[in-house]
Amino acid sequence: MLALEGLHKTFRLGGGWERPALRGVDLVLQEGEFATLIGPNGAGKSTLLNAVAGTFRVDAGTVRLDGQDVTRWPEHRRARLIGRVFQDPLRGTAASLTVEENLAMARARGRRRSLRLAVRGRERRLFAEWLEALGLGLADRLKQPVGLLSGGQRQALALVMAAVTRPRLLLLDEHTAALDPAASRQVLDLTCRLVAEHGLTVLMVTHNMEQALRVGSRTLMMQDGRVVLDLRGDDRRRMGVEGLVERFARVRGQRLVEDRLLLG
Ligand SMILES: Nc1ncnc2c1ncn2[C@@H]1O[C@H](COP(=O)(O)OP(=O)(O)OP(=O)(O)O)[C@@H](O)[C@H]1O
């Protein structure tokens, strides 16, 4: 479904400074796989998601989606195949538009038609049904501007908008991290429900070890621009949070030692 081969990306910061962020990432996600991605700060997790989404061109390597080489496709073209939810609830929805207008916008995107925000009766009933099923109190607020919603409600809406277009791949970049614990749990439950209902293929960045092991079917760990751990099946089931924390501390410790060597 998603196949990454030899991805490299170095950010050039001016004054001759360079920051390598991806140093040869190889990764295959099968259709319907739900992988979580952890790693210390600066490991390259968001850069990897950006490379897949086409936010920038990679320096080397290929990105394949459904067997198509999309490496040179611009972001907007890849967006027809890829849904994405960010950490910031403000990024996935348009604050000045109503809940139903946001949903209409998402549906129009999924159908590859021009944007049409006028919502008719049948469509409104369909939206109400979707939101009713979430049980987050959104169904009665179809005509309210999204700017009036709580962060959790807004993130739930962003998730529904990303899922209803039936993307071939869903990228979740710490999408529950900015929410309070109750909202975070609700949005994570909703994520699992939507993923199961639509049979989505998912790559989800998280800093929560428990989530990284218990949510989805595969756990990846990055360090210094590479995937350094890939757990699934029995290995994953046997791995406890403590074991993962220990592996994480080890890669982070190594990073600190390397940084000290560099600074020294
Ligand atoms: N636009 C950019 N310009 C310059 N450097 C960047 C840019 N984006 C990322 N980097 C650098 O690339 C490296 C990887 O960053 P990235 O944001 O992908 O890490 P991350 O694993 O997502 O970290 P975090 O968990 O803190 O979000 C870091 O050294 C970061 O400073």
Label each PLM-derived region with a short phrase.
Residues 1, 10-24, 74:
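A short, flexible loop at the N-terminus of ABC-type nucleotide-binding domains that lies
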Residues 15, 19, 57, 69-83, ...:
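ABC ATPase NBD coupling module
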Residues 38-40:
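The feature captures the beta-strand-to-loop junction immediately N-terminal to the Walker
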Residues 53:
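Helix-to-loop junction immediately C-terminal to a conserved catalytic motif
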Residues 61-68, 229-231:
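Conserved ABC transporter NBD signature motif
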Residues 162-163:
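ABC ATPase C-loop
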Residues 206-207:
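H-loop/switch region of ABC-family ATPase nucleotide-binding domains
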Residues 236-264:
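ABC ATPase nucleotide-binding domains
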